[in-house]
Amino acid sequence: MSNRDQSLATPYLQFNRSQWAALRDSVPLTLTEEEIVKLKGINEDLSLDEVAEIYLPLSRLLNFYINSNLRRQAVLEQFLGTDGQKIPYIIGIAGSVAVGKSTTARVLQALLSRWPEHRSVELITTDGFLHPNKVLKERDLMKKKGFPQSYDMHSLVKFVSDIKSGTHQVTAPTYSHLTYDIVPNNNKVLEQPDILILEGLNVLQSGMDYPHDPHRVFVSDFVDFSIYVDAPETLLQPWYINRFLKFRQGAFSNPNSYFHNYAKLTEEEAVGIASQLWKEINGLNLKENILPTRERASLIMTKSANHAVECVRLRK
């Protein structure tokens, strides 16, 4: 099969790093180095080059899509003869634990809010829609946290449905990685943002991923543009272990941390525990529930060592 035939056989356009970077097209970098440091995750080296070469072209593409969506809404309003209500544009970000979804979400939030239109951009993680630990313990699901059955999918779907229905005020529960649980009485209130970035393991999942809980509507039905942050497991596992070691030195040392006991481990013991957690929980969830959703994404960002994106695939 020729390269042209192979290109026609895939639903994606593929770009290497330099090809993708060229699509920035003179868009100015509106973030300072100090701001970028605040946006990066505990386990990542986020550079100015990464933002300029990967995220600026992506923010430019998203700006085109968002403007196109606004024009489509205007056409519908003209046809109906109505003043339509404000409908947020939803960007979904999926991928494995430790791949850097949260950093991607924060960088895009910062960049999209700095476009000349000065749009309001909210960021919500689906962690807030996990069942509380009390419920997970009752259902013997603590070791399945992050798996489809650990989420209150009905509440999550209602949340995105209300957002897309133009509801003026919508609330979302919040999750604490310190206590490893939902924070009671601490809902975040969203008031019709222009853009909602929804980040989580499960934003691309559909009916086939929830055979235990049949319902007809899914988060992915409401997402306008979806991004899958990808990396080979040979990188993901060491990233996860390294992140665990950094938490051991930092967050785990807090007496209020759910994982406070891990702070007392030797490095060798910590690596052993993290490797076991990856094998039994996060790696398993990746293979069974997250990776199978990758090809549903509008765009796939593939990372290499040091969390640098080396390839971008964009759905035609």
UniProtKB/Swiss-Prot annotation:
Primary location: cytoplasm
Alphabetized UniProt keyword annotations: ATP-binding, Coenzyme A biosynthesis, Cytoplasm, Kinase, Nucleotide-binding, Transferase
Superkingdom field: Bacteria
CDD domains: PanK
UniProt subcellular location: Cytoplasm
Binding-site positions, ATP: 95-102
Keyword Kinase included in the entry's annotation: yes
Biochemical pathway: Cofactor biosynthesis; coenzyme A biosynthesis; CoA from (R)-pantothenate: step 1/5
Catalytic activity: (R)-pantothenate + ATP = (R)-4'-phosphopantothenate + ADP + H(+)
GO molecular function: ATP binding; pantothenate kinase activity
GO annotations of cellular component type: cytoplasm
Annotated EC: 2.7.1.33
GO biological process annotation, one example: coenzyme A biosynthetic process
Pfam entry (one): PRK
HAMAP family found in the cross-reference section: Pantothen_kinase_1
Family to which the UniProt record says this protein belongs: Belongs to the prokaryotic pantothenate kinase family.
Name of the protein in its database record: Pantothenate kinase
Gene: coaA
